[in-house]
Amino acid sequence: MEPWAGCCIFLRGFSFLLVLMTEGAKGGPFKESLGVCSKQTLLVPLRYNESYSQPVYRPYLTLCAGRRICSTYRTTYRVAWREVRREVQQTHVVCCQGWKKPHPGALTCEAICSKPCLNGGVCAGPDQCECASGWAGKHCHVDVDECRTSLTLCSHGCLNTLGSFTCSCPNPLVLGPDGRACAGGPPESSTSAGILSVAVREADSEEHALRREVAELRGRLERLEQWATQAGAWVRAVLPVAPEDLRPEQVAELWGRGDRIESLSDQVLLLEERLGACSCEDNSLGPGLHG
């Protein structure tokens, strides 16, 4: 058989002769699922063309024994078409009033609600909403105040929220794992005093380092002030020569030394401020702790 000789179906057209077989005719309307009033099976006769492999016998001549010419045949295949007629079953459901099919070929029905069900509600029946927890009303638009129900939801305080509620506890109690019952707060850490003691020692070490840095800068400042005094004497020795008679390198050197003196003075003031901030009074670290 050739590779192209497989079967394929080509629909040319079909006519419908519907034979209704309504289920539940004896015992009332058939209900397969919610909202389905009847179910019908339709016998639909179909007529279409179908391709198939048709054998073809072709004669040919061949050489037989005794050098005789014989006539025989071989089989080949070709694609041919034939008309097929058969009946197929189709199922059709009829929805009850207030229900509809999700799509035309569906075998189930869903309820129709004229207004949508809000806040996670679902349409469970004709114009009937099934609301999610925490909501009520015809269209699930009313928030339920759980805190005013007869049920004890929280061991202490209860606060209503949209669609739910939250519990609260008075100090020093805290909410437990279930979010409703209150339990004792976490015990005060026994290492708090030790942590503060370490902080005090670190602050003392930083203060000593700052004091050393201030002393070093003060020494440098004193040396620069001595040089400034000498420079002033030198300037006075140069004067009463007019300032415009000073050489440019002399003016530049004077300005540079003055800038360094001003910069060091600013650093000393900044360190003194930091040193003052590090100084702690006896009760600044809490009761019972001293620097």
Curated annotation (Swiss-Prot):
Instruction: Respond yes or no to whether keyword Secreted is given for this record.
Output: yes
Domain EGF-like: from-to ranges = 110-141, 143-183
Q: Which residues are glycosylated?
A: 49
What SUPFAM superfamilies does the database record attribute to this sequence? Answer: EGF/Laminin (SSF57196), Growth factor receptor domain (SSF57184)
Q: Report the GO terms under cellular component.
A: cell surface; extracellular region
Which cysteines are cross-linked by disulfides? 37-96, 64-70, 95-109, 113-123, 117-129, 131-140, 147-158, 154-167, 169-182
All residue ranges annotated as the EMI domain in the record: 33-111
Superkingdom of this entry's organism?
Answer: Eukaryota
Q: What is this protein called?
A: Epidermal growth factor-like protein 8
Gene name?
Egfl8
**Where is the protein situated, by its record's location annotation?**
Secreted
Q: Which GO terms describe its biological process?
A: vasculogenesis
- A Pfam family annotated for this chain is EMI
Q: Tell me the first and last residues of the signal peptide.
A: 1-27
Q: Which InterPro entries match?
A: Dev_Signal_Modulators, EGF-like_Ca-bd_dom, EGF-like_dom, EGF-type_Asp/Asn_hydroxyl_site, EGF_Ca-bd_CS, EMI_domain, Growth_fac_rcpt_cys_sf, NOTCH1_EGF-like
List the residue ranges forming a coiled coil, or say none.
198-231
Q: Name one GO molecular function term.
A: signaling receptor binding
**UniProt keyword annotations, A-Z:** Calcium, Coiled coil, Disulfide bond, EGF-like domain, Glycoprotein, Repeat, Secreted, Signal
